[in-house]
Amino acid sequence: MNEQELKQMIEGILTEMSGGKTTDTVAAAPTKSVVETVVTEGSIPDITEVDIKKQLLVPEPADREGYLKMKQMTPARLGLWRAGPRYKTETILRFRADHAVAQDSVFSYVSEDLVKEMNFIPVNTKCQDKDEYLTRPDLGREFDNEMVEVIRANTTKNAKLQIVVGDGLSSAAIEANIKDILPSIKQGLKMYNLDFDNIIFVKHCRVPSMDQIGEITGADVVCLLVGERPGLVTAESMSAYIAYKPTIGMPEARRTVISNIHSGGTPPVEAGAYIAELIHNMLEKKCSGIDLK
């Protein structure tokens, strides 16, 4: 499938998901880089709402337009300034705020209401809490006998595809993207007469947990949608790890990975269409990872 065909497939999925309605895209009006701070009853505006791509703190730059054009190409913290040897207060506060968001995403859990709403099958790895999950990665790859039976009893044996959702290192990534990407994958698979059901949700999930799920279910392809380690740019980045007939202890080279799935990277709807195509190719060629190249 070439780039034009992939684009047409994505447009078709979007049209079908919206009930055939099309929406005109209106360009957002540019906002000023200088935000006036208004204190009301002892509170100030949320500093994280400032678009750092449009914020230039360098006083009297030689080429303001060129600087701002460069900042549009990257979310990196360019165009900062200093007071003596240190960063300005606004820069320090924004750094700490973004770091706090990343920490919150790691230590929080995916909402139980979301798991119920999506009709996921909830299971847990051998980790008992977040501390054990972070310090014992090996336990995040395995299920105890009770969880093995839950997986076996609630999934279709030897299915062509098993979809798995895992919290990973970012619960925010799952909550931000999962409602958009799953319908996109399902719509994309319809083009190849493929479908899936009985989605597993793994709490305290590490990527290799998909290998044991593959052995339990006997699925031809296992696709794991998992929250990735958050950074200072975003805490909502999700990845898809896909493997053909995964087995415990298999080399990482057998996995195909699509990363950086979020609103500021690869949009979840677009990623879903590409994932559907990859799953079809794996089933056709009976391989994944570097063998699929």
Curated annotation (Swiss-Prot):
EC number assigned by the record: 4.3.1.7
Required cofactor names: adenosylcob(III)alamin
Keyword Lyase: yes
An example Gene Ontology CC term for this record: ethanolamine degradation polyhedral organelle
Domain of life where this protein originates: Bacteria
Subcellular location field: Bacterial microcompartment
HAMAP family from the UniProt entry: EutC
Name recorded for this polypeptide: Ethanolamine ammonia-lyase small subunit
Origin organism lineage: Bacteria, Bacillati, Bacillota, Bacilli, Bacillales
